[in-house]
From Swiss-Prot:
Name of this protein: Putative amino acid transporter AAT1
CC annotations in GO: vacuolar membrane
Disruption phenotype: Reduced survival of extracellular parasites. Altered morphology in bradyzoites. Increased cyst burden in chronically infected mice. Unstable inter-conversion between tachyzoites and bradyzoites.
Polar residues bias locations: 16-25
Organism of this sequence: Toxoplasma gondii (strain ATCC 50611 / Me49)
Leader sequence segment: none
Length: 717
């Protein structure tokens, strides 16, 4: 059947290949060239690559049109090649910049190869490392407050919420073409203000960093003192937290999360080692416990446990940056990243929460690692490793937080005017009307090279006294070997014709002026004519730049590097002469108008002080230091980790993890790929999680200030 269909397709004119692998195939009657003939495929491929330098995006894989042929099809082609005594390419030649499919690479090579930027492993580990640490250490305490059965049910529910919302954000960021959480929310629902989302991300990031530092202050001094590495380390908790900034600060100033991809594996390894130690110690501790195991324990602390479990899966501020850096972000790869990250977190959280609760029953502390004996050296090694993972968790959270802070500052403080920049000693910058000679614009699937052509002598000013001859000679040499776009050539002809008409009119007017009395009036008319001519030249130059930027890709000769300098010098001379010959009244009016606008702008933004503050805050190092300082001061005075985690999970995690993804889902991919009933049901479920999380935050606040909702100690024991 397959061979018959294949032969029929060859008779029609070529081999039918999948859409993502389709290449130009010769007809069946044309035999492939022999070994003596020159290889035409390479020349055709090179010409094709030169004409279209960018590859179109591949369609999503499906069962009907896979990216690569199946094994049966490959075997049939190999048999046919052997019988016909000729060799046909099974796959199309891989162009430069493309990578082989992972399906053809053995899993051993993929598993133990270095982690590349934007790979599946790097994305999964970065997502998992973003939430491992502070949340997982409070899960045994949350399991104690709710009971074993309810705690496991909450873990399963929050795992699904984490997976589904991560997939929503990553797929929607590709759908809307956005790279930040705030931009994605604003594009999905324009009613959502971008500043509010950025502010939520900033506050959530600072709170998460606070929880990391609180746990670090509990772990690091105790482990160093019990391992006899630093005697009396518990008395120097503040000094150790300040010393950790030496490692946290350099990692936090990195502009991208992919810079930390080689460190993202360490928190996972540290937690795996801690899990193995918890399992080993639980074999002895379970036999010593006599308290009953509670399967269901409903009280007011249920809401605190709900938020603790929710915060344990909080990774969503890093989803959009990771999706932006993901290589080949197709739907299957996005699905794999979301599912694998959620399953990895669930497989680590469930045994730690269960065994941590069963090992200590009703006396589990908010940081369950503090329940172990102070003489247990093995657990102190675990706490030391977890301390290092906390140190790495702060930069993973702070990098997207600083990006949102930059976006918030840019939206609050508009770009300063030229006089305000000059007041601070900054030289004003003029926008050039000429685009760069070789301007490369890179998008997801397109690399476009545009060429800006310089003026010829006819299209220039035309006067030798203004340097037109020198500029014409310079541009004449630059134009050799550069193919002019078809859209620009009619404009050049029109500009040359207009300049020739003006030169003839100028010559006729000079011949008609026979007396000296009208020479002054003639000079004034000549100045007006030259001013109009320069304005026409400037407009023509701008239209040429636009036409050249929208033209298709052209090959540029290696000797055309001086063409850009000639264009820029010609444009600068034109603007300078136009400013020199501007009437004094117009110049004074223009300067007065600029000064008035300057004073109004300074009054709105608070003057030069606000401008200087904006310049300082645009520095990433200053912004990171401004974020870490208040977080460090709060970590020095706080010691209740679960309360901090519960408040964060209620106020911010519910917004970023369920509320905003539900709105993005309903307005974006849910409106396209889901039925109305399914879409509404999922949105109601996510909004329900949001409401419970917000109500839990209120309960935690009331319990903290001893207002109400207190749980008797007899219920816990």
């Amino acid at each position: 059947m397959r061979e018959g269909a294949f032969d029929a397709s060859r008779k029609k004119g070529g081999t039918q290949r999948p859409s993502s692998l389709s290449t130009a195939q010769p007809p069946s009657d044309s035999r492939p060239p022999s070994s003596s003939s020159p290889p035409s495929s390479s020349s055709s491929s090179s010409s094709a690559s030169s004409s279209s330098p960018s590859h179109p995006p591949r369609p999503f894989p499906s069962a009907s049109s896979p990216w690569f042929p199946t094994c049966e099809a490959s075997a049939e082609k190999m048999d046919r090649a052997q019988t016909d005594s000729r060799q046909e390419p099974i796959l199309r030649p891989v162009a430069a910049g493309e990578e082989a499919s992972p399906a053809f690479v053995p899993w051993q090579t993929r598993a133990f190869s270095p982690i590349a930027r934007g790979s599946l492993r790097g994305s999964v580990l970065t997502l998992a490392s973003s939430c491992l640490g502070a949340g997982v250490l409070a899960t045994p305490y949350a399991m104690q407050e709710t009971g074993l059965l309810i705690g496991l049910s909450l873990l399963c529910m929050h795992t699904f919420v984490s997976f589904f919302t991560t997939y929503i954000l990553m797929a929607s960021s590709k759908f809307f073409g956005s790279s930040t959480y705030a931009e994605l929310a604003h594009r999905a629902s324009p009613r959502l203000p971008r500043r509010a989302v950025d502010a939520i991300i900033v506050l959530n990031g600072l709170g998460v960093c606070l929880s990391f530092l609180v746990f670090l202050g509990d772990f690091l001094p105790a482990s160093l003192e019990n391992l006899q590495l630093f005697p009396r380390a518990t008395d120097h908790r503040a000094a150790l937290l300040c010393a950790s900034m030496v490692v946290i600060f350099p990692l936090s100033v990195q502009p991208r999360l992919s810079a930390l991809r080689h460190f993202a594996f360490f928190p996972v390894c540290a937690l795996l080692f801690s899990l193995s130690c918890v399992v080993y110690r639980s074999l002895h501790l379970l036999r010593e416990q006599t308290a009953p195991i509670r399967l269901v324990n409903l009280n007011w602390n249920f809401f605190k446990s709900f938020n603790v479990f929710l915060f344990a899966f909080m990774q969503h501020i890093n989803v959009c940056p990771i999706g932006r850096e993901l290589q080949n972000p197709t739907d299957p790869r996005v699905y794999k990243v979301s599912l694998r990250a959620a399953l990895l977190e669930y497989c680590l959280y469930t045994p730690i929460a269960t065994l941590g609760y069963l090992s200590f029953r009703g006396v589990t502390k908010q940081n369950f690692m503090l329940n172990y004996s102070s003489e247990d050296q093995l657990m102190h090694v675990c706490t030391l490793l977890l301390s290092f993972s906390m140190v790495l968790g702060v930069p993973l959270t702070l990098i997207p937080t600083v990006d949102s802070m930059f976006s918030l500052l840019r939206s609050l403080a508009p770009a300063p005017r030229r006089a305000a920049r000059a007041a601070l000693g900054e030289a004003p910058r003029r926008r050039s009307l000429v685009a760069p000679l070789l301007h490369a614009e890179r998008t997801d699937g397109l690399v476009r090279v545009t060429v800006s052509l310089a003026f010829e002598k006819e299209g220039g000013l035309g006067d030798a006294e203004y340097g037109g001859a020198e500029a014409g000679e310079a541009t004449r040499g630059c134009g050799e070997g550069v193919e002019s776009p078809g859209e620009v050539q009619p404009e050049q002809a029109d500009a040359g014709a207009r300049n020739r008409d003006r030169s003839r009119l100028h010559a006729d007017s000079e011949r008609s002026a026979g007396d000296r009395e009208g020479s002054q009036a003639e000079e004034e008319r000549e100045e007006e004519r030259s001013g109009e001519e320069r304005s026409v030249v400037t407009a023509t130059q701008a239209s040429r730049c636009e036409g050249s930027s929208s033209a298709s890709s052209r090959s540029v000769d290696s000797g055309s590097g001086g063409c850009q300098d000639a264009c820029e010098s010609r444009e600068t001379r034109t603007r300078f002469l136009a400013l020199e010959e501007e009437p004094s009244g117009d110049r004074e009016a223009r300067e007065e108008r600029e000064e008035r606008e300057e004073r109004e702008g300074q009054g709105r933004r608070g003057g030069e002080l606000l401008l200087l503050m904006g310049r300082v805050l645009e520095n990433r190092k200053v912004c990171v230091a401004a974020c870490l300082l208040p977080v460090l001061l709060l970590a020095l005075v706080l010691d209740k980790a679960a309360d901090v985690v519960g408040l964060l999970g209620g106020f911010f995690s519910t917004l970023l993890m369920s509320a905003l993804p539900s709105i993005i889902f309903y307005a974006g991919i849910g409106n396209l790929y889901y039925r109305p009933f399914t879409r509404s049901l999922l949105m109601v479920f996510l909004l329900g999680v949001t409401c419970v999380g917000a109500f839990s935050s209120v309960i935690i606040i009331l319990q903290t200030f001893n207002v109400c909702c207190q749980v008797p100690r007899s219920v816990l024991h």
